[in-house]
Amino acid sequence: MKLWKRAAVVLKDGPSLIAADDILTAAVVKATSHDELSIDTESAQFIYRHVLSSPSSLKPLVSLISSRVKRTRSWAVALKGLMLMHGFFLCKSTVAESIGRLPFDLSSFGEGNSRIMSKSGGFNLFVRAYFAFLDRRSILFHDGNRHRYNEESSVLIRLVIIRKMQIIVDSLIRIKPIGENMMIPVINEAMENVVSEIMEIYGWICRRIAEVLPNVHSKIGKTEADLALKIVAKSMKQGGELKKYFEFCKDLGVSNAQEIPNFVRIPEADVIHLDELVRTAMESSEESAERTEIAEEEEEEEEEIETKLSDLITLDHNEEAPASPPRVVVVDIPDLISF
């Protein structure tokens, strides 16, 4: 059966290899082959070394990968294409930040026959989950959001960036193989990429939370305090989810998940402190709104009195003078305009 599959791979990838007009194009075809049983690591490493030494080659490489992924119905080609793109970030190529939104859409890959019980249904779901993560990650890093995180950034900007990174972690832990038929080397290597990414991003989040919390004090606004509290609550929940995810990966035999990290827990005292800040900010906001409402009511009363006073002291020049001298009416103006 394996021999038949390998023969099919040769038939599918052969024409593309023959048509390849340079060694780099051939490397992309090999790294994204139809082979569901193995992955050509050497070709992928060759591509990464080339990009690191010649950053300008990334754009044509992305076009090659995109062209191959767009027209395939093979989960193996699609997944390997995603892994190859992900590798540009993992190998610390700064030029990878120029990619932005992925130039292909795999959000509905294989949806026509993606039932869980079907032969390739689990693989198609895996591809869609991997794409959702990588597309979101590529967009976030393209915007340079993480790199705007510095001491000069406002507390709100830093909190927003941390929250976006937490969303990236959420998309990572949704990447899971379903079914025993998915326990193969290609999936295992993809999971190693996922675990590596989680370790880097979640570690970054924990360090940044520790940095920004001391800057969350009573003088900041309700928006900042409320967002900080949500981030801390999410971090505590995410720590538990990641522990379960790593246990899952360990059972799968993912090599870099054999030791479950001691995920940082936010001290309960910090959570209580943030909660108090949010409550105080809310009460202050309510008091401010009440004072504003009272001031507006007083202003309306002043306008009404001024209108009445104006009516009292306005002379009607069109009125004819009476025959006899009018009775003198004394208007105590100071009393009318005193408040």
Curated annotation (Swiss-Prot):
* Regions of compositional bias (Acidic residues) in chain numbering: 295-305
Q: Does the keyword Membrane apply?
A: yes
Gene Ontology cellular component list: clathrin-coated pit; clathrin-coated vesicle; Golgi apparatus
Cite the entry's keywords alphabetically: Coated pit, Cytoplasmic vesicle, Endocytosis, Golgi apparatus, Membrane
Gene Ontology BP terms: clathrin coat assembly; clathrin-dependent endocytosis
* Chief place of localization: membrane
Residue limits of the ENTH domain?
Answer: 16-148
Question: Where would you find this protein in the cell?
Answer: Membrane, Clathrin-coated pit; Golgi apparatus; Cytoplasmic vesicle, Clathrin-coated vesicle
Region Disordered, as annotated, extends over 283-307
Q: What is this protein called?
A: Putative clathrin assembly protein At1g14686
Lineage here is: Eukaryota, Viridiplantae, Streptophyta, Embryophyta, Tracheophyta
Recorded GO molecular functions are: 1-phosphatidylinositol binding; clathrin binding
